[in-house]
Amino acid sequence: MSSGNILWGSQNPIVFKNSFGVSNADTGSQDDLSQQNPFAEGYGVLLILLMVIQAIANNKFIEVQKNAERARNTQEKSNEMDEVIAKAAKGDAKTKEEVPEDVIKYMRDNGILIDGMTIDDYMAKYGDHGKLDKGGLQAIKAALDNDANRNTDLMSQGQITIQKMSQELNAVLTQLTGLISKWGEISSMIAQKTYS
């Protein structure tokens, strides 16, 4: 098993091969010895559990990064709409302003809906040659804010999940340490009895 399997962000599948014990003519093969040794089996199970928890945490970490980036990018577009709304507010109630092309493209690419409509459908229904009144501009900003908030929430939930996975990793490591300690004690006692 390569160390790349347990690094943050690794997408590699978990591969684990049980190879505990020693192999020589007196003791038989490694597999025979590990099957007879409950400590080796326990150690193997805990290592597999450790790798599984780590893989889940890795995937969640990648999700958190994506959600954070999406929330940040969406908030930038929302701030851009603030400027357009402020410009529209300087005119009268019928003043219309153009929705920035990069905002339209961003909403289209990320599937952000306004009142259940795509940005293209919304512009076709309420737009006037790519321009919207203040209410329409505010509806677009609200849709962007909702998307940013949703991704921020997903990011927070992901961080909580990672914290829980870290606690589970620590618990498994504690169990591994205890098992290795007991394994060593028993091996030492057997060696003393055998060779004394």
Curated annotation (Swiss-Prot):
SUPFAM superfamilies: EspA/CesA-like
Keyword Zinc-finger: no
UniProt induction comment: Expressed when growing intracellularly and is maximally induced 6 hours following infection; expression in host cells is dependent on an acidic environment. Repressed in conditions of high calcium and by osmotic stress.
Keywords: Protein transport, Secreted, Transport, Virulence
Classification via InterPro entries: EspA (IPR005095), EspA/CesA-like (IPR035074)
Major subcellular site: secreted
Secreted found in the keyword field: yes
Disulfide-bond pairs as recorded: none
Phenotype when the gene is knocked out: Mutant is severely attenuated in virulence. Disruption prevents SpvB-induced F-actin depolymerization in human macrophages without affecting intra-bacterial SpvB protein levels.
A GO CC annotation given for this chain: cell surface
A biological-process GO annotation: protein secretion by the type III secretion system
Cellular localization per UniProt: Secreted; Cell surface
Cited function: Effector proteins function to alter host cell physiology and promote bacterial survival in host tissues. May act as a translocator that mediates translocation of SPI-2 T3SS effector proteins from intraphagosomal bacterial cells into the host cells. SseB is required for correct localization of SseC and SseD on the bacterial cell surface.
Family designation: Belongs to the EspA/SseB family.
Record-linked NCBIfam families: PRK15364.1 (NF011891)
Record text on subunit structure and interactions: May form a complex with SseC and SseD. Binds to the chaperone SseA.
Protein name according to UniProt: Secreted effector protein SseB
